[in-house]
Swiss-Prot record:
Residues 1-20 are annotated as: Disordered. This is HTH-type transcriptional regulator PuuR. CDD domains: cupin_XRE_C, HTH_XRE. Residues 12-66 form the HTH cro/C1-type domain. Represses puuA, puuD and puuP. GO terms for molecular function: DNA binding; DNA-binding transcription factor activity. Residues 111-178 form the Cupin type-2 domain.
């Protein structure tokens, strides 16, 4: 990919250009506006996860591929330290992906932290299933037009092919651990 320290917008711009796409064409294919892509690529705003997923789908990349180091170890790691988790979140939502460098993995696990008043943005949709448990605080899961209020100790299981979102409407932090299959991140 590109340099390790490169800002996300700059990396998105490089990827788009490597694929021979104009900003306007990337906007058409992703369903975003040209101005949104321009603003993101200039690193004036940090895109929501759902927005980033739309762009990466056009570029044929998963979130983990986008955020991973370009060089993968020959042997997948067995023990993954906290410092090795891949941060994929933005705008008050931290999503740390447990990734061992195995490109053929079929399961993804994410540690999610939602600051008060934050959300994943517009509804997310990707192939597969997701299960998760609220470890601390509370979260509102919206799926199929229905809001589900979950508190610490409660779990959820959803078909991620149905658009869904998570919102922390409380005054406290919410922490979730979730697993996804297949690995769309």
């Amino acid at each position: 990919m590109s340099d390790e320290g490169l800002a996300p917008g700059k990396r998105l711009s490089e990827i788009r250009q490597q694929q021979g796409l104009s900003q306007r064409r990337a906007a058409e294919l992703s369903g975003l506006t040209h101005s949104a892509i321009s603003t993101i690529e200039q690193d004036k705003v940090s895109p929501a996860i759902s927005t980033l997923q739309k762009l990466l789908k056009v570029y044929g990349l998963s979130l983990s591929e986008f955020f991973s180091e370009p060089e993968k170890p020959d042997e997948p790691q067995v023990v993954i330290n906290q410092d090795d988790l891949i941060e994929m979140g933005s705008q008050g939502v931290s999503m740390k992906l447990v990734h061992n460098g195995n490109p053929n993995r079929t399961l993804a696990m994410i540690f999610e932290t939602y600051q008060p008043g934050t959300t994943t943005g517009e509804r997310i949709k990707h192939q597969g299933e997701e299960i998760g448990t609220v470890l601390e605080g509370e979260i509102v899961l919206t799926i199929n037009g229905q809001d589900y209020h979950l508190v610490a100790g409660q779990s959820y299981a959803i078909n991620t092919g149905i658009p869904h979102s998570f919102s922390n409407t409380s005054a406290g932090i919410c922490r979730i651990i979730s697993a996804h299959t297949p690995t769309t991140f």
